[in-house]
């Protein structure tokens, strides 16, 4: 029995070191993002939809029109998080971390451009715009936008956690949201 418990403890500790977001956490995260956007009315909804469905070669959608809505979106997102626990904020930070990591790719950077920080902030913008746009960029990096940025989204839940609970959340993911940290996204040339 003690051998089994020791083995279980090691497996659990290892699993905690490389914790990935659950499907439930991801669904809750995207629902929260959508709720924050929905509260702002039809104009940003139409802009977001147009961004996610546009022809990246055409000039018929101004991708920067959404920038005026980012601060109200972030304020509303903050309001929606007021009653979240430490664990919930950590879970959401883990989701953001994973989403940023998954699009930390050279093919996305080729479209967005930017320094390491600039590319991180652009990926934050992609996440902030919502799931439909995020998935469009994942599938076709040409959908990304040159020099867009939302620095606040990159550490949004981590900052809330720090403000409310006095420390930075430990996501236990074993990955980094920083630029050029996803080796699968940056093949050696």
Where are the regions that the model predicts?
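N-terminal domain-onset segments
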Residues: 8, 12-101, 105
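Alpha-helical structural elements
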Residues: 24-25, 32, 64, 117-120, ...
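Core of folded catalytic or high-affinity ligand/protein-binding domains
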Residues: 75-148
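Basic, alpha-helical nucleic-acid-binding regions used in initiation and control of genome expression
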Residues: 131-136, 140-189
